[in-house]
Each structure stands twice: as structure tokens, then as C-alpha cells.
Amino acid sequence: MKLILLLPVLLLLSVSTYAEVCKTITPINTDPYLAEIGTRKVTFVTLDLNTGNCQVINQAGLKQRHGPYSTFKIPHTLITLETGAVKSVDERFEWDQVKHPAKAFWPETWKQSHTLASAFKHSAVWYYQDLVPRIDPKQYKKWLAKFHYGNQTFTPGSDMFWLDNELKISPEEQVAFIKCLVKTRCGVKASNIAAFESAALQETMNSVSLYAKTGAGSIDPNNNDGAFEGWYVGYLKDKTGKPTAAFAIYMEAESFASLKNYRKELSLKLLGDLGFM
């Protein structure tokens, strides 16, 4: 009986402690951005890693979970390196056109061989799908739990669980995961963090380095010409290599084209206006 009573308490403490991502939450004045945001629905959160304070757009959306799509390449890359599924970020896979026939929406950059690093950069889904048989389902379960990654739900052997809304995560949880990663490494070896960052570095501006990943999918999985949802998730480091901010933007728009570039553009504009860049 004591064990039965104790476990829920421990679980509650674990979840509540991890959920305390922000010391304070301050709404961002969206007036300067409304004209360009237009009909898009936006949830944004940035966490100041020095103060623990958050600034947000649409606080009500912070805890709403959505499929991570290709933002899952952040934890997936780390899991891949930790489990030895590849020897390094430079390990190359050949594109199997029979196993992964090109679809109409595929960019040309997917239709070729890739390394883990280039697959991350170009968001080549097939490479990460080919990693699934190399990673024991017990390892996925272990690392999703270590990362407190959303609902931690997946079907063993599935190479679509991060794309078909089985696995879900909220903007708040995305930022909590990034915070864990850059503050305590979340159980990941320092060498694997460094290898990941070599692939995840997007750009350096004004001595600030940006590490991030996009993700997107159609709201109706049977209609790629309709409304889309998308992410841009990552963190910033200053010129000394110290992490300064973690952020996540979730966006819904009338089409993929409407959010393809804008999710990053708006994120960088907000981070700049808030003094992080």
C-alpha cells in the first residue's frame, strides 16, 4: 500500500518540477507584428537562460501539444549518437528509391545520399526513417523519458511516429527540453552534444550562434494543398559559447508556403527585438 501511495506522489513531483520552465511569464506586445502575421495563428515562447524568465505570444497555447514533425530531429539525432546507430554525423546512407520513392512534395535535396549532418540540415525524412531499425525501441522509450519529451508515445518499429501525431509535444515542453539539453546535457555525452551542434548550427549573427530546426505537416494528412502547422525550435549562444535563450514557435497557416519561411523570420525578429540577437 505504501508503494502504491508513494509512486503517484513521486511522479507528481517529477512532472511538476520539470514543468516549472518559466520563473515569470510576460506577454509580448504583438501590435508591431499583427499586420504581417495576418491570419496565421502563432504561439511563441522564449526562455532567458540567465534569468529563467519567459516572454510569450498566446500564453493559452503554451501547453497545447502538437506533432513535432521534423523538430524531432533534434532529440532523434542525439538518440542516434548516444545509441551508436551511426558512428558519427558523417556516416552516409544511400537513398533507396524502392523503399523510399520520391513523393511530389519532396525537394530535390532529399533525392540523394545523405550523412546524418546533411539529413538534419536538409530535413531529409527518409534518412531518419532508416535509423529506426537501428535503434532498439527500449532506447527510444528511455531517451524520450530522459528528455521528458511531450507525451513520449510511439509504436515500436514505426518510422512515422513523429510525423503522424502519435508523438506530441507542446511549445512549453519544447523549450523545457532545450533548457535541459543546454543546461545539464539531459544525460547526453558532451562529445555527442558537440557533434549535434556541428549539424544544428544555422548561422552566426553579431557573434550570436543560432542552433535550430524547423518542422511542419499538413493539418489534414490527406491534403498537402490545405492548411499547415509548423515549428521553429532552438537556442542561442553568445560569443563565449554560453547559451542565452531557448525558444519555440508554433504556427498554423493556410498553406505550407505561408509558414515555410515566416516561422523562422518571425522568430528571429522577435528574438532580436527582445534583445537576444
Tell where the protein language model's regions lie, with residue ranges.
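Sec-dependent signal peptide recognition
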Residues: 2-8
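Structured C-terminal helix/loop/strand segments within mature extracytoplasmic catalytic/sensor domains
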Residues: 20-34, 65, 133-138, 182-277
